[in-house]
Amino acid sequence: MTILKNIPKVDKVLGWEGLKSLLAAYPRPVVITAVRSSLEALRAEALRGETCAEAFAEKGVVGRIARELATVNALKLKRLVNGTGVVIHTNLGRSPLPESVRQALNEVAFGYSNLEFDLALGERGSRYSHVEGIICELTGAEAALVVNNNAAAVLLALSSLAAGKEVIVSRGELVEIGGSFRIPDVMRQSGAVLKEVGATNRTHPRDYSGAITPETALLLKVHCSNFAVVGFTAEVSAAELVELGRGHSLPVMADVGSGNLVELSGLLGCNEPTVQEFVRAGVDVITFSGDKLLGGPQAGIIVGKSSLLAPMKNHPLLRAVRIDKLTLAALEGTLRLYRDERRALKEIPTLRMLTASAADLSRTAKALLRRLQRAIPATVKLSLSAGFSQVGGGALPLLELPTTLIAVTADGMSAQDIETTLRGCPVPVIGRIFKGTFLLDPRTILNDDVPALIAALQTLAR
């Protein structure tokens, strides 16, 4: 095609005056790759008849290359605005950290630290000692250990306590926790032999006792936090399982999952057990997450009897799943807030969002609406409507949190157009579409998000 003759050669483009600033700003190999990519895209558009002569001029080509370089060199992991109303959104990074944790992270990240150095003795120390004390203080457990996530915590515990031996678990608790990641798979990987008992909806103490053999090493309870079985149901409580285990000299382990340290039943009207309840029930080993209801960084926390955690601390697998210094700093900073429950509810974003009342959210939504309306063109229309938020993170799946939503419409744009545009902004804004309307939930929009939200909404104006 004649139009293809207008596409400049790579060498010619590299010699253009307009490219000098890009060559000064980026490594030459990166610029060359962007030039080739841009010219190839231009060729494809020309073949589809989607371009004109001006696109081949120096100004147009250089502009395309500059945009390509900006995209290529932008950080892939970036901040965004969570307007979905899902508080512990796994795909959006789960729990945002408390502001007070920022200083702790800065100090540890940009300098040396006593990660594995005992300042009192002047010799090598343990990275796990920095948080073990406060975890035991908050939960009432004898000992604690932290790894990089809860799946790793379960894997380490099972590998240490039950490799090559039987682990008995209720059939109704063989959960999948997301991403096709299933408890039976973790058990097999640990070397433990899965022995399921009971029915999907009903399991009794006699089901466990009838399955115990000389090869049984552990009784396992898994908290079903991401689904609910209702109707004709029965389950064995942690206390009942502990009594059964002691009668057979078997340890009991519980995967609590969401890691709740605050009594939420009075605040949210739900029944989500706390880690402390499992400790008081006498459960020997308990595992839970750091970045769900606890509101901290991704981590797996193991608490329980000292005699059972001691071999985990010396297990070869611990090295593979150990926690890093930044996560330790963030976790310690978050846990310290729990020493004052009122402060924790106020300063830990996850807890603050979850416990915000409908009246508070109505006031927040109205104030945010006024602020947005003052800053965006009239072609972008905003309105309020009642709705519900979700907890997310595989916790409290049946709980609906009343909220006030902000509906967004724009002239000439469908809800899908709005979603795509906002998602493509420098600071992406993620909302949800319901019944053909794009919605933002103020519950999960942080104060610092508002300038970026305004800038994103301004791009909808036409």
UniProtKB/Swiss-Prot annotation:
Matching entries from Pfam families are given as: Se-cys_synth_N, SelA
Pathway per its UniProt entry is: Aminoacyl-tRNA biosynthesis; selenocysteinyl-tRNA(Sec) biosynthesis; selenocysteinyl-tRNA(Sec) from L-seryl-tRNA(Sec) (bacterial route): step 1/1
What is the protein's major site of localization? cytoplasm
An annotated Gene Ontology molecular function: L-seryl-tRNA(Sec) selenium transferase activity
Source taxon at top rank: Bacteria
Question: GO CC annotation: what is one?
Answer: cytoplasm
Q: What is its EC number?
A: 2.9.1.1
State what this protein does: Converts seryl-tRNA(Sec) to selenocysteinyl-tRNA(Sec) required for selenoprotein biosynthesis.
Q: What is the name of the protein in this document?
A: L-seryl-tRNA(Sec) selenium transferase
Give the encoding gene's name: selA
